[in-house]
A protein has these predicted regions:
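Class I S-adenosyl-L-methionine-dependent methyltransferase catalytic core
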Residues: 1-137
């Protein structure tokens, strides 16, 4: 599982509890990355974690998934603090049959999400102020 903009790491921990073997988490804010690691250690899950303290938008695919892709990619960008990034490039990191789930603002939906939804490439599920953008490879 690839957890982008990982924050507290709770989505990765949840994925592990549901059978994921390993989580690659990416969080660029040092204090958040530290808390994420402490959470995994508190649950004795640090052996199942690879943590990168990097900017998601400048990641190198070869560095993160040298042995292949991911079955699940989850991203929850801090869209209140930044323009919502175009995350479609991460779809190519999925294994066949994999799923990418990105949180996006329900208001001011990014243009690329609207385009992908209109084309039938993604499903968008709205939950109040947030929406889930779901892509299946």
């Amino acid at each position: 599982m690839l957890d982008l903009f990982a924050g507290s790491g709770i989505m990765g921990i949840e994925a592990l509890s549901r059978g994921a073997a390993h989580v690659v988490a990416v969080e660029m804010v040092h204090s958040q990355a530290h808390l994420l690691l402490q959470g995994y250690k508190a649950l004795s899950l640090e052996k199942n974690l690879t943590l990168y303290e990097k900017n998601v938008l400048t990641l190198d695919k070869e560095e993160l998934c040298a042995e292949g892709g991911f079955d699940l990619i989850y991203a929850d960008p801090p869209f209140k603090d930044m323009d919502y990034p175009d995350l479609r490039s991460f779809w190519q990191w999925l294994n066949p049959g994999g799923v990418a789930v990105f949180e996006a603002p329900s208001r001011n939906m990014p243009a690329w999400v609207k385009e992908a939804s209109d084309a039938g490439t993604v499903q968008v599920r709205r939950y109040g102020e947030s929406s889930l953008v779901i892509f299946r490879s």
